[in-house]
Amino acid sequence: MLLNCHSYFSLRYGTIPVQRLVQLGQEHNISAMALTDINNLSGVYEFITACQKAGIKPIVGTEIRDDNQLRYILIAKNQKGFGEIGRFLTKLNERNTSLSTTAPEFKDCYIIYPFASAPTHLKEDEYIGIRSEQLTLLYTEKWKSLMDKIVILHTINHLNEEDYNLHCILRAIDNNTLLSKLTDRDCAAPTDIFKTEEQLVVEFRDYPIIIENTKELINSCNYSFTFKVPRNKKHYTECKQTDTDLLEQLAYTGMINIYGKDHVKAQERLAKELKVINELNFAGYFLITWDIIQYSNSQGYMHIGRGSGANSIVGYCLGITNVCPLELDLYFERFLNQNRKSPPDFDIDWSWNQRDDILRYIFSKYGKEHVAFCGAVSTFKYRSIIREIGKVYGLSKSELDSLTRNPIEHHKTNSIVLLIHQYGQMLEGFPNQRTMHACGILISEDPITNFTALDFPPKGFPVVQFDMHTAEDIGFDKFDILSQRGIGHIDEAAELILQNQGIEVDIRNIALSKDEELCNQQLKTGNTIGCFYIESPAMRGLLRRLQCDNYKILVAASSIIRPGVAQSGMMQEYIYRHNHPNEFEYFHPVFEEQLGETYGIMVYQEDVIKIALHYGGLPATDGDILRRAMSGKSRSLEGLQAVKNRFYEHCDAKGHPRALSEEIYRQIESFAGYSFCKAHSASYAIESYQSLYLKTYYPLEFITAVINNEGGFYRTEVYIHEAAMSGANVLPPCVNSSDLQTTLIGKDLYLGLKLIEGISLELLKTILKERKANGRYESIFDFIQRVPIAIESLQKLIFIGAFQSLGKQKNELLIQAKLLLTKKEPAPALTLLQEPIQEYTFPTLKRSVHEDAFDELELLGFPISCMPFELLKTKFRGDVMVCDLLQNHKKTVRMLGYLIARKHVPTSKGSMYFGTWIDANGHYFDTVHFPDSLTEYPFVGGGCYLLLGTVEVEYHFPNVQILKMARLPFITDPRYHYDDDNNQTTVSKVKEDVSLTHRQPYPKASEINLPRHRMKFTK
């Protein structure tokens, strides 16, 4: 009887979670129910799964609305009908046109029109839906001949009055209006609540034919769906055998090129992998990935292949990855095993400005009917909810700010705020908008609209209406097509080296950079600012603590830095064991046997699986469940709990001490979703080496590429400082030498025009276009004649030094500009002779370095004419410099530091911070700020601080544990020397990088309960 149920996937309309809807059906013995969310199919598969578990017949369809007006409801008779709905909604979304009041032709769908707007003539599969309150209208003659076409249409949208109020709030949010301004047309009827079949039979008892019509329609729907059946494109060629033959041929050709013909281990590993790939029908998946890489190579694009697929020698021989599984002894079972139902992940990275071309190739090659992005759903988050709900209740911006900043306890007497809080809690976690997965692409065997409708976001690539978890449930395995800025850094750096020095660097030849001697020395000292994945303060500190000087240690470090290892409490233990390899005992002989390379500590996902199988005695199927959990793919808490129970049972049966087993499983759990497989770390390490090689031998070109491609850990100012420390002559943006991006000419680094704040991109493009067409600008007069510009923008260009190439002082240029712009007349359409440039003679009006620095601070956000320290009132530069720290272990020192970044870290005693600074010599150092110190001496924004603290040297890495600190004042802005209102405003432009961490505090050594020497556990 329930042919029109909305879930909360009727975005900003429905209020009932899918599981709750089905649960209500089960509680009231509903035999069949239809999910018909508004203009989408997002909740269908969750609904089907829930109905199958509840013993309810699932019926699927959609409610078609146009500008919130109900047109009709579509119900799928079968799988073909569901595909028809998918294609219809897709066409609707793609064209974004208005709907006709009547439905188009459907072969395998029922159409139900609302009673109030039903057409006079109905086709065979068209019906009229009537609500109980409309039954009195059936007495007219018009309806007698249509009685066999009328069915019950009771809408379920909310559960009770409170739910209805939530629905109204959602409608107000969607319409961006006040609750008080909503009309009946905007909202559902208050009576659209859950009703049982018995209630509906009573309401329609005078019209048994309508009841019978409804039952017949329900009974005739036979939509069924089988989960976990592979839906990906099956074959790259015409069939499995030719796929297998081609894959084998390509793999062996690649193997010979890499290893030679007589490499026995490579042959054995390759044969083993190919056998399993064939048995699991994954050849097509490998070949499609290979095909994408072939296109990429043909375009000259650089890529990085990572993920669990990088454990594969097949992937290595095909050129998908650049990680040799033999060199690193990569664990085959992490990549592929007989219990694995889905193919291994190949996460392929391209440069951020090349990925769209790769995507266009995939859509073109495999057909738009068969390719789409995986979907995702953004949900309402509490803080944003409070603001959204506050708006619809009419709160002002200041009230909303107060509401989001202060806890609810501050507003207990305000009834409106209490309502906002009440409905905010109800709304938290509700779907808000459909969006797209960051990188997941689905390539299907059958048309993808057989399974869903498609959305078309602004970029134009189609997106399915379900997320990655649902995709996997129904049989799709995504291809991860990613982009990152790090590859852009490497690519552009190689181009700049060729342009600037005439040297062609084959950076894709990893033998050039991996384990290169000078690079290893840079690693060891943490001199890695700008380098992919190894430039953060935490990573640079780890590299120094480990004295990392080779590829294999870097591979381990790339995984150790992940939260999984740190959350287990084992990062510090790894550092200790690495530095004291003869001063510890393994937890158990299995750890020595399986994890000897990592000193008996679980570092990679493979390590967790090895310990689960060999220490815990779990079967390989449980290992696969753990693999999925560590990859962030498992949603089955019951499945994980069952694995945990079996782990303890097997450990007890093996006679392992219970305390040891509990500690080991605690470490295993910490890896869930926050760890790398070894091959993934190895792929990252190779890219890190590539960028480090360029930084080591071609620092100016590399840092220029980092600035231009963005995406580094630090703000642009830090990379410009790094360039200056590497010998660059840093110059302000220049109308004659700069592009939008930063430009390197020899050792002169001209900052990009786009770095200037407050000047439109259109104007900057006009300046460059005119320069390209008619040559450099010879004077300010010449510039004004050629570029239409307002005085405000021109003054900014002058202040930043963009006309420095003209050889004139800023003050002189400012006067010239004002005179010229106030007198400027429209240029004649045609002139036979170029008018002579008008020149003015002015007295010399020099500006100080400090004035230039404040101009730069205002327009760039940082000074380049001098270091920030030179703007301080004090001449003090610190008692101790960075170069002295290693000799001052345990001593209290005074230092002066310019704040680069600070990172928040939760502890059991409150928040603490790690700070990164540069000293007056331009060198980096790190500080630790414990909660007690921060209470009295907090950070108060960017700038230079006087620091008092104790130097602690931990495994070759010094940091300063801060006791006291204070930000030091800058000099008065010399440009506003007599203007007390403005002479300190520019200082607020000084920036800092702040990162916040939202996680549980890492365990202390005392909480881990595993000393370095083996405990004498009792059974």
Regions found by a protein language model. Give the residues of each.
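Domain-core and long-helix interface of multi-subunit machines
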Residues: 1-35, 39-54, 87-168, 202-207, ...
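Active-site or pore-adjacent capping/gating segments
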Residues: 165-246
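Glycine-rich, histidine-containing beta strand-loop boundary motifs that form or position
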Residues: 36-39, 60-64, 76, 152-156, ...
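Metal-dependent DNA phosphodiester-chemistry modules and their immediately adjacent helices/loops
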Residues: 66-68, 75-98, 174-194, 340, ...
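Short gly/pro/ser/thr-enriched loop/turn and capping motifs at secondary-structure boundaries
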Residues: 41-42, 65-68, 82, 157-161, ...
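Noncatalytic, beta-rich nucleic-acid-contacting surfaces in large DNA/RNA-processing enzymes
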Residues: 32-35, 51-53, 190-191, 241-1019
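Short alpha-helix plus adjacent loop in nuclease-associated cores
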Residues: 11, 64-77, 156-177, 346-348, ...
